[in-house]
Amino acid sequence: FGQLEAGVTDKSWADEFFVSASVSKIDKELQTGSVQSWVYGMAERNTESANVSVRYNKADFLVKDLDVHASLSQTWDHSQTVDTVFRKYYWDGSYIKNASSEIRGRGKSLRHYKRPMTIVRSNAEYRFNDKHSLNLNYVLNRAGNKQYDEMDKTYVPTNDVLVKHIVGLSYNQSFLDGKLNNVFFLKDYINHLKVEQTELSFITGSDAVKPSNTQSYWGYGVGTRLTVSEPWAIKASYEHSVRLPIARELLGNGSTIYPNIALRPESSENFNLGLFGNITLAPSHHLYYEVNGFI
């Protein structure tokens, strides 16, 4: 693993601007499958990765009281799963000959996975005055999943793509000299999935989804915090939350996790209520407490 970073601070055009690059290489012997009783002896997963990232921060961007934070990360990941031995192994290292390979239980395979990933994060906050501010947040996560096999000529190469856009808008209030704070927020979760793989559709669910589809899901909520005095403060919140599946859950990891392409986002209704404060026991001794309840 190696990493290099360079940048500048306190410039007229940027409070902070950094560029970094890193490379890594991992050679991993696989010990078990999805269950501990499924023992591997010669299966391997080798990975080479490279990353370039940029981050930028600027207060009073273009206009006064507009703060901007942005970052970009691009990763190139190439993994190779080696499954070329017709053996069945046991925990003591012994084995017997088998009619199929260790991982897939089929013919010999030297499967390649190229998974480029792009992550963009940006945040802009504008303060109207000491009591009101508006915040806009955007996150892009794009993961590719190109697969091909050097040895299994029956395998059809595929190129899947998962793209997630999350756009959030929040309005913040502060009253009573900062003792009462409210936040109202709205989020749009956009999920785009393009799938070419059809192997093991009875496991992956690839036959149950369209080859290319885009879905949008809304989240929203409100939160408030009231400080009565330093020892006594109360906070409460409600959120209709959404969790989009990550790339590993949808597309698998190429060895121990099968793809689950038909997996849908999770949603929940969350209520939180809490009591917290800071009690001064002596001039140099303070006790902070917090009690929370949620459903």
Model-derived features: positions:
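Outer-membrane beta-barrel translocator/channel fold
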Residues: 1, 223, 233-245, 265-269
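Face-selective signature of the C-terminal outer-membrane beta-barrel domain
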Residues: 5-25, 47-205, 209-219, 225-229, ...
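Short aromatic-enriched loop/helix-cap "lid" or pocket-rim segments at secondary-structure transitions
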Residues: 32, 82-84, 247-248
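Surface-exposed beta-strand-turn/loop segments characteristic
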Residues: 1, 29-33
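Membrane-embedded beta-barrel scaffold of Gram-negative outer-membrane proteins
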Residues: 235-239, 266-295
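Outer-membrane beta-barrel domain signature, especially the mid-to-C-terminal portions
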Residues: 197, 207-214, 244-267, 295
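Predominantly the C-terminal beta-signal and adjacent terminal strand-loop region
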Residues: 40-47, 251
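Short, glycine/charged-enriched secondary-structure capping and boundary segments
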Residues: 34, 150-151, 198-199, 249-252
